[in-house]
Regions:
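N-terminal active-site segment of His-dependent metallophosphoesterases
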Residues: 1-70, 142-156
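Binuclear metal-dependent phosphoesterase catalytic core
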Residues: 15-17, 21-24, 31-35, 109, ...
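A short, conserved beta-to-alpha structural element at the edge of catalytic cores
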Residues: 28-39, 77-91, 225
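Metal-dependent catalytic neighborhoods of phosphoester/phosphodiester hydrolases
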Residues: 16, 49-69, 84-98, 126-128, ...
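His/acidic metal-ligating clusters that form di-metal
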Residues: 32-45, 69, 130-200
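Short, charged, surface-exposed secondary-structure boundary motifs
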Residues: 86-88, 110-113, 188-189, 220-225
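Conserved catalytic scaffold of divalent metal-dependent phosphoesterases
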Residues: 9-12, 86-172
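Active-site neighborhood of phospho(di)ester-bond hydrolases with catalytic His/Asp-centered motifs
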Residues: 5-7, 46-51, 75-81, 101-104, ...
Length: 227
């Protein structure tokens, strides 16, 4: 069983919102992503770390969730900052196709892989509201990590999904990365970063944890092999 990741699909199946206005890398990007998944099997896992759909409400997001459900393997999703349709986790789960799992304040175990996740927040947002949101996300991340610990048994592999980068432009340690180290996470996947000028390393290892950027435009619309 292999684990792959790709994020920031920004789907709009029923109400097309052209993404190529953001650059040629977005030309036919969904076709490129699908081609990159052709080698996946039904036993493999695909992680999608947020910004799944442009929809504003859950009913409008259903076609996008069905698109995700039709991708190969078992899918695990988290909320991104543009997923305005994602409000109640129970409501979201009621609309998920078979084989799609949503993580929020908890975790899921598939085979020998335990996956947790949370949206996170920008470490660079020093506004009062930003500090409040960052603190709240720390609590949620810790809840998910605790849930992972309860599911984990000897020999299991652990992956945490977070939408926002967990560190700053200098890749310095943060309260979020300290939590990952405390719980001994193997791999962290994240997205959110876009454009030619963003501070992006596709792979970075710090204190024994591998961090993988999976924003589709940053990885040439090709799913990243995680495990």
């Amino acid at each position: 069983m292999k684990v792959y990741a790709i994020s920031d699909l920004h789907l709009s199946i029923n109400n097309p919102k052209p993404m190529d206005v953001f650059g040629t890398v977005w030309d036919n990007y969904l076709d490129d992503i699908v081609r990159s998944l052709e080698g996946m099997t039904s036993d493999d896992i695909l992680l999608l770390a947020g910004d799944l759909s442009w929809a504003m409400g859950l009913p409008q997001a259903v076609p996008d969730l069905e698109y995700i459900g039709a991708l190969p393997g078992k899918k695990v999703i988290i909320r991104g900052n543009h997923d305005y349709w994602w409000k109640s986790i129970s409501a979201v789960r009621s609309k998920l196709p078979n084989g799609v799992f949503a993580v929020q304040n908890d975790a899921v175990k598939i085979g020998d892989v335990v996956v947790g996740g949370s949206r996170g927040w920008s470490v660079d947002d020093k506004s009062e509201d930003g500090k409040r949101l960052y603190t709240r996300e720390l609590i949620r991340i810790d809840m998910s990590l605790q849930a992972m610990q309860k599911l984990k048994t000897e020999g299991d592999r652990t992956v945490f999904m977070i939408h926002y980068p967990p560190f700053n432009v200098k890749f310095e340690g943060t309260p979020v990365t300290e939590l990952f180290e405390k719980y001994g996470i193997d791999v962290v996947v994240y997205g959110h970063l876009h454009g030619k000028n963003c501070y992006a390393r596709k792979s970075y290892t710090k204190n024994g944890i591998k961090y993988l950027l999976t924003s589709c435009d940053q990885v040439n619309n090709t799913a990243v092999l995680v495990l």
